[in-house]
């Protein structure tokens, strides 16, 4: 790969991390990321550089570590039912929002 690709990935990661500073809520970041990801999935990006840049952006913006830590705390409290419910809700809601972004993208184009 050329150095130019690495610079683009780095810039996408910086932008995503910068945006993350303004939104300090893991759930909202996850919803926004899922919506945008669903929107861009439909674009069927043909260039690998675009795919790589978007991967870098979404990896930094929607870091799943915040949810994992939240689920870890719930699990350590011993509330297994709450853990199972939250884990499933997080996955289901994000999938639905991602599909909604995909649907919006289809309606626009």
Swiss-Prot record:
TM annotation in the entry: 21-41, 52-72, 84-104
The keyword Iron is assigned to this record: no
Catalytic activity annotation: fluoride(in) = fluoride(out)
Membrane as UniProt keyword: yes
Compartment annotation: Cell inner membrane
Membrane topology summary: Multi-pass membrane protein
Keywords: Cell inner membrane, Cell membrane, Ion channel, Ion transport, Membrane, Transmembrane, Transmembrane helix, Transport
Source domain of life: Bacteria
Pfam families the UniProt entry points to: CRCB
Gene Ontology CC entries for this record: plasma membrane
GO biological process, one term: monoatomic ion transmembrane transport
Family in the record: Belongs to the fluoride channel Fluc/FEX (TC 1.A.43) family.
Entry function: Fluoride-specific ion channel. Important for reducing fluoride concentration in the cell, thus reducing its toxicity.
Protein name: Fluoride-specific ion channel FluC 1
Organism for this UniProt entry: Prochlorococcus marinus (strain MIT 9312)
């Amino acid at each position: 790969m050329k150095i130019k690709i690495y610079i683009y990935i780095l810039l996408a990661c910086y932008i995503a991390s910068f945006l993350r500073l303004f939104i300090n809520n893991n759930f909202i970041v996850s919803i926004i990321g899922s919506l945008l990801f669903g929107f861009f999935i439909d674009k069927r990006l043909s260039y690998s550089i675009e795919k790589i840049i978007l991967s870098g952006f979404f990896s930094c913006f929607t870091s799943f570590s915040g949810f994992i830590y939240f689920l870890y705390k719930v699990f350590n409290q011993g509330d297994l039912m709450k853990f199972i419910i939250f884990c499933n809700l997080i996955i289901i809601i994000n999938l639905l929002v991602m599909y909604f972004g995909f649907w919006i993208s289809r309606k626009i184009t």
